[in-house]
């Protein structure tokens, strides 16, 4: 469902942000 899509997108976004912070 839509909520699952939101959860997946949020996790992906958090991963992306976390890795860019780690690369700083």
UniProtKB/Swiss-Prot annotation:
Keywords: Amphibian defense peptide, Antibiotic, Antimicrobial, Secreted. GO terms for biological process: defense response to Gram-negative bacterium. It comes from the Eukaryota. Expressed by the skin glands. Transmembrane segments: none annotated. It is found in: Secreted. Its main location: secreted. The keyword Secreted applies. One of its GO terms (cellular component) is extracellular region. Antimicrobial peptide that shows higher potency against Gram-negative bacteria than against Gram-positive bacteria. Has a very week hemolytic activity. Belongs to the ascaphin family. This is Ascaphin-6. It comes from Ascaphus truei (Coastal tailed frog).
């Amino acid at each position: 469902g839509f909520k699952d899509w939101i959860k997946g997108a949020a996790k992906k976004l958090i991963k992306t942000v976390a890795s860019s912070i780690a690369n700083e």
